[in-house]
Amino acid sequence: MMDARCIVNAGEFQKALEKVLKVAPKKCSIPALMEVLVRFDGDACTLTCTDLELWCQASIPAEGGSCAFVLAGSRRLLTACKFLPGELEFSYRKGQPPEHAPTKTDLDGDLWISCGGKEICQRVTAAEEFPELPDVEAEHTYTVQTASLRKRFERIKYALSDDSIRPCNQCVKFFDNRIGAVDGHRLAMNRDEALCVDAPFHIPPGAMRLLPVFEGADCQLLVGKRRAAFDSGDIRIITKLPEGESLDFDAAIPRHYPEGYTVNISDFVGNLQYLEKFISNPSREPIRFNGGVLLLHTKSGDYRSRLDMEDAPRQEIGFRASYMLDGLQQFQAKKLDTVSMQMNTPVSPIILTDQVDTALVLPFYLNRAA
């Protein structure tokens, strides 16, 4: 029999366990994917989870020997960790492979976890049952301020597509100093000179949603042909990259706007939220914007609300209330008071911008509205 004894700080282990479990599926036909791979290697303990598309790995200091196993009941252990202060001691005994070809059961082992007067003893799965961590052959490497990138993603994620036929549109596009999202009805993007990429690529939203695990620390973004990784040394997120092309953002945004106005964001949002209460069929009941007045016609009645604007549009344009609200809230998240609204014709996209963030909302064709 092979034995190993390892020690970690209980609080650090709980924190790392909570981070990596964000990736593990709660239900899966492959049992190992619902659990955490734990690997001790002398002075480090590394925890890994995956759903085969996305990987999350966290390392913490450790003492002791070397061993690896797949936990049983990882989420229950996470809950139990709050009752285990101080040091956690892991004692692992792996089954000795027989002379004949070993079976899965032969390679499984026994694990004891002790802390003070508390002890857990359970059968655990052999590390060989867990998928191997993929390599990221980086062609480009960038330094990322995760706190800033997280905020930028939160502002634009509303425009991500759910169309699986176009996987790139389900992802965040990184191009020059910008990131963007588009779903066919809306477009959202923002820029930051601190992160400028050499060639466009697309990061799935699952990886972007994991940025909080870095707790604001800077990391390296490694981009290859098939995979990308956010890596701070202690935390690593690996994701597959989608194949195909996405929208050319610059080609989609009109360059000439004969009409431009400054709108008060909270005033516009409040008036839209008021009118939205009377909408029963969003796909057939647009907001009409004419002369600074928001108009809504429904089967139950007509409703209007006037915006606080010094200069009002000279042409009528229609839009879906929820789409415009999403665009305005992109700027509201930055705690801005006003934003520039730019329009071309009643059938051209409506642009909201502060020169750093941009939101595009497609118009509603009013000749079909009634």
Regions found by a protein language model. Name each.
Residues 1-370:
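Structural preference for solvent-exposed beta-strand-turn elements
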